[in-house]
Regions:
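N-terminal subdomain of lithium-sensitive/metallo-dependent phosphomonoesterases centered on the IMPase/IPPase/PAP
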Residues: 1-92
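DPxDG-like acidic metal-binding loop motif
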Residues: 85-143
């Protein structure tokens, strides 16, 4: 399966639904300020960050099970190859605005970019969901 022919709108909707459930289950600042380990970038990882990233990776694993090959790049896990890896990159930030999410300030988002190569200039699909406004933006670039 080609990564770019995947149902990215559906994938993103499922991730948003799972993350909403995670935020609802950890509604207080105390529940959201639990640390667990250190991420790939060297920062301490909030449990809520890890759980939201797990929701993204569950969808990526399902995509790989359908035969897609790509490399996921995340703050917590670093680079993770799926299938044969290759040039395609899926760049994720499961909680952009972790401090706000931790403080239960509804100004944080989910960001996903899918690129045909190693550079952000290679991005062909992008998605951002703002949990405060509960709005998402999905873009596809068509190169000529």
């Amino acid at each position: 399966m080609d990564v770019f022919s995947a149902d990215w709108p559906g994938i993103c909707r499922r991730i948003v639904a799972e993350q909403r459930a995670i935020f609802a289950a950890t509604a207080s600042s105390e529940e959201r300020t639990v640390y667990e380990g250190v991420g790939e970038g060297g920062d301490h990882t909030l449990a809520i960050d890890r759980r939201c990233e797990d929701a993204v990776f569950a969808e990526l694993e399902a995509l790989a099970a359908q035969g897609a090959s790509f490399v996921a790049v995340s703050e917590e896990r670093g680079e993770v190859s799926f299938g044969s890896g290759g040039e395609t990159r899926v760049v994720i930030d499961p909680i952009d605005g972790s401090l706000n999410a931790r403080r239960t300030i509804p100004s944080h988002s989910l960001s996903i970019a899918v690129a045909s190569g190693p550079s952000m200039a290679d991005v062909e699909f992008g998605f951002v969901h703002d949990f405060g406004a509960d709005e998402g933006l999905l873009l596809r670039w068509h190169r000529s």
